[in-house]
UniProtKB/Swiss-Prot annotation:
SUPFAM superfamilies in UniProt: Cyclin-like
Stated name of the protein: Cyclin-dependent kinase 5 activator 1
Reported impact of residue 138 to A: Increased susceptibility to calpain
Organism: Homo sapiens (Human)
Stated role: p35 is a neuron specific activator of CDK5. The complex p35/CDK5 is required for neurite outgrowth and cortical lamination. Involved in dendritic spine morphogenesis by mediating the EFNA1-EPHA4 signaling. Activator of TPKII. The complex p35/CDK5 participates in the regulation of the circadian clock by modulating the function of CLOCK protein: phosphorylates CLOCK at 'Thr-451' and 'Thr-461' and regulates the transcriptional activity of the CLOCK-BMAL1 heterodimer in association with altered stability and subcellular distribution.
Modified residues annotated as Phosphothreonine in this record: 138
Chain positions with Phosphoserine modification: 8
Disordered, as annotated region: 97-136
Keywords in alphabetical order: Biological rhythms, Cell membrane, Cell projection, Cytoplasm, Lipoprotein, Membrane, Myristate, Nucleus, Phosphoprotein, Ubl conjugation
Length: 307
């Protein structure tokens, strides 16, 4: 009888199972190692991404700060310029409150010239009168006011003093002559408004002061010369192109009238231009005319004291 070798199938199955188990375990270990590597890679990628985001955020903040800084500096510059402009405008508005420096004095001549001129008997150095200057360094402003009737009264008093030979002349007589001519031209339609105004009376006074002589011997002669000056005042200061001669004529001969006109023009042409071009000269003549009334009061006071 032969020997029978029996092989248990469970052993084989166990071996296969063990092998299978070993194989699956090995596969599981390999998969676990791969998963561990993937996890490590994911961790590294996450770790590397977080600092990058922070860097990007920080750099963005820096860029924003750099962009904001020029705007803030620009606003600061604008504010500074506005303050400077405000200060300049305030300083310009307050210029009148500041005192201007006095004008520079001309250099004095050498001592040798002064001594030489003094030894010759008279000094050649003369001090020019200085105009009145205020604290601000500008010439003093003079304001003179007077009505037409007041200036006409002053003109009549001046003519009475100038023509001392005319004993019966009243200060109102020249005023009546002037107003009669002005009214006649208004009624005839040669002018729309009266010519007798303060400025025109000042112009007439300037002419009469240099033209009318103290040697006038009659009222008729004074009236002829006064109306000649009035005609030139109308021609120079009036609004119309021309005026009729009849209201200004006293004598029948027109040649005598035109001769007087030419003599007055030759004598007073420069002053007639100056009184319109120079306001200071006009103010001076205005003041002189207004002071004529004060001179009459002084004269009456002296006559009363003499009596």
């Amino acid at each position: 009888m032969g020997t029978v070798l029996s092989l248990s199938p469970s052993y084989r199955k166990a071996t296969l199972f063990e092998d299978g188990a070993a194989t699956v375990g090995h596969y599981t270990a390999v998969q676990n190692s791969k998963n561990a590597k993937d996890k490590n890679l994911k961790r590294h990628s996450i770790i590397s991404v977080l600092p990058w985001k922070r860097i990007v955020a920080v750099s963005a903040k820096k860029k924003n700060s750099k962009k904001v800084q020029p705007n803030s500096s620009y606003q600061n510059n604008i504010t500074h310029l506005n303050n400077e402009n405000l200060k300049k405008s305030l300083s310009c508005a307050n210029l009148s409150t500041f005192a201007q420096p006095p004008p520079a004095q001309p250099p004095a001549p050498p001592a040798s010239q002064l001594s030489g001129s003094q030894t010759g008997g008279s000094s050649s150095v003369k001090k020019a009168p200085h105009p009145a200057v205020t604290s601000a360094g500008t010439p003093k402003r003079v304001i003179v006011q007077a009505s037409t009737s007041e200036l006409l009264r002053c003109l009549g008093e001046f003519l009475c003093r100038r023509c001392y030979r005319l004993k019966h002349l009243s200060p109102t007589d020249p005023v009546l002559w002037l107003r009669s001519v002005d009214r006649s031209l208004l009624l005839q339609g040669w002018q729309d408004q009266g010519f007798i105004t303060p400025a025109n009376v000042v112009f007439l006074y300037m002419l009469c002061r240099d033209v009318i002589s103290s040697e006038v011997g009659s009222d008729h002669e004074l009236q002829a010369v006064l109306l000649t000056c009035l005609y030139l005042s109308y021609s120079y200061m009036g609004n119309e192109i021309s005026y009729p001669l009849k209201p200004f004529l006293v004598e029948s001969c027109k040649e005598a009238f035109w001769d007087r006109c030419l003599s007055v023009i030759n004598l007073m042409s420069s002053k007639m231009l100056q009184i319109n071009a120079d306001p200071h000269y006009f103010t001076q003549v205005f003041s002189d005319l207004k002071n004529e009334s004060g001179q009459e009061d002084k004269k009456r006071l002296l006559l009363g004291l003499d009596r």
